[in-house]
Amino acid sequence: MTALENKCAIKMENITKRFGSVVANNAINMELREGEILSLLGENGSGKTTLMNMLSGIYFPDEGQIYIHDKPVTIASPKDAFDLGIGMIHQHFKLVDLFTATENIILGLEGKLDLNNARKKVKDICDRYGFDIDPDMKIYDMSVSQKQTLEIVKVLYRGADILILDEPTAVLTPQETDKLFAVMRNMKADGKSLIIITHKLHEVLDVSDRVAVLRKGEYIGDVMTKDANQQSLTDMMVGHSVTLNINRPEPINVTPRLKLDGLTVFDELGVKRLDNVSFTINAGEVLGVAGVAGSGQRELLE
């Protein structure tokens, strides 16, 4: 059965959320189907995270009704969301650095806890979906990618069959992103339903089945990913045609203003932070420096 033929895992009817005089979400009607990866797109401030925070129990809607598997529900707290099988992986991780992966996963659970059984269950989840996590590794020894992976394993351990990932690739390398998407496809194949919030259009086209778009707190519509491209999605996000290919004029004065040649930097612990970095900035030029967190941008500017 395809996602098109599946029932709704989530149905949101006329969901409205206000913060004082600001309407963050206005009468939103949106669905997530069972066994589907849905990308939620929108500019900054369009209301994406606010909408998802109502599904995860952080906010409560001022108006409207949420249905989970066709049943009307009230989600007044994160516990309500967990009890309904909804798990949200936030941009900022909620892990205790001094604890192991397994200890973080069972932290806060009620009843008698068996660490050995928990460790085995964590390993089973990792093997099932393709996660690469050592159940006994301390959080302070983990990379950013491993911490994010652990957050996903944590919600699966607690029984989530609906997962919401808020900007999951913002801190990942391209290789780590590919690995995450492979895991997401494994979860989808196992019947999980997923929502991914992202700004990266090429990732939307790569991993999702369907795309829903918000603009200024309003639900604009949805489109099957196979029928979309970066241009059409951008137009939906901003409300008018946008030129993605920008041709900038060449600077008239190409006099070098700053030149780096083979710059290498070690931090106070002797760790190499920059290795043989070279570039030239000319007059009238804007140079962009890109990289995931910890790639050396701060050391370069300092």
Language-model-detected regions and their locations in the chain:
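Glycine-rich phosphate-binding loops of nucleotide-dependent enzymes
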Residues: 2-302
